[in-house]
Amino acid sequence: NEKEVCLSMALKLGALIKERYPDIKIIYTRSTDVFVELAERANIANRNNADLFICIHANAGSTTAYGSETYVLGLHRTDAQQKVAERENASIALEDDKGAKYRSYDLTPDGIIALQFQLAVFHRQSILFAEMIQKEFKRIGRYDRGVKQAGFLVLYKTTMPSVLIETAFLPNPTEEKLIGTAEGQQKMALA
């Protein structure tokens, strides 16, 4: 189950960071298996004046897809990026108000100008961090699918450098086995 695997990896990553850098304050959007709305995930980081937002996911796709990729906020530039953003943003349907709070997420020409302004503030820092993540995935033997851009709502709402990490492809049995074990999750967290 993606949400349980990703929660486990996030908690393992947080513990590793705390162990290596005890002065860093770790703030989780959730520490138990509960659903947190997309806007609230970003709001938690914003309210706590976070310096960095990391969102951990497991990818969907074909049973033969493999590797790790990291996303930063960007405009939908291709059909493939649009589909990925739609899939990640689909959890809006699970929210009580079915997305009424996201009406400000606007990709009209005016919305795009506003989004470009927001992108300029933290975009470069997000890309640099995403590149470091991908380098670490490569170091542990993961196939590097690269740093990509998409209009994920959870990244759009943050006011700090932010990344969404797609750790592995759940439909691929080998990838599912990797992140489905405590050992595999620890390996991913160490990256």
Predicted regions and their residues:
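Active-site-adjacent mobile loop/cap segments within catalytic or ligand-binding domains
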Residues: 58, 111-191
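Catalytic-core regions of hydrolytic enzymes
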Residues: 1-104, 119-131, 186
